[in-house]
Each structure stands twice: as structure tokens, then as C-alpha cells.
Amino acid sequence: ILGDEIAEARVLDLYAGTGAIGFEALSRGAAHVTFVELHAPTAAAIKASALELGVAKRTTVVIAPAEKATTRLSGRFDFVYADPPYASPPPHLTFGNLRARRLVDASTTLVYEHGERGDAFHSPGFTTVRDARYGEVMLQFLRTVEIAG
């Protein structure tokens, strides 16, 4: 999923859960990973893992809903991974915030994970580059595009 574009990248792991995607990015040379996780005990476990792995200085853990966290983040991300609960609708507000606050641009890869029965993400300002399927897991790779008008 991550590929070679992760080296030296700034990564945003939304709905981080265990932080597996973010930690994988760090192991592949990401410069920094911001983990966003709503559940405080899970976020604490991410912090503990970062300390244990010796990568705490290259991580930030935000305890907040993704749609709120994306109104407070700064900088630009090279890679964004969003894995909301499968019963949730696509993250329109969250991705909209990323775009509006210029946290992503046309060079940013956004990956939206959803179940095979879940809806794909479709919204002005974003285009699907490719889709991938891993068993029952669907991955939608997106980029931002200019909106005409």
C-alpha cells in the first residue's frame, strides 16, 4: 500500500486504531507521522508503542474525532490514510477540511479504506487514481484536483 513514496514523507494516519499504517510508514523512512485517534486509551497505546520503538520524536498523536482534528492540524501532508469504522459514511467533512486548510495538494496521495459493502468517496475537488481490493477490504487512492469555477 505504502510504496516507495513514503521515504521522507509527512504522513497523516486518520482513524489510526493501533497505528499499524503509521508505524509501517515510519519503518519505511517517513519523516513524521501524525496519528489521529478518538479513543484515548488507544491513542495512549500508540504513544507507548512510539516510545518503545524509538520513534516518538517522529510522531504526533492527536486525540480527537478526525473531522475536528483536521481543523487544527497545520503543515502539508504527503500521504494520508483514512480508515474510518466500516459502518461510517465516507469522510466528506474530514477530507474537505484537509483540502480547505491546504493540508493536502495535488501531490498528496490520499487512501480511503472501506469495506466491500461501503460507499466509495466521491466529492468535487478529488479524483480517484485507482482502486484496489484485498479480500473484503477496498482501498480508494485519491488526489486533489482544481475545482472549475
Regions found by a protein language model. Name each.
Residues 1-149:
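Class I S-adenosyl-L-methionine-dependent methyltransferase catalytic core
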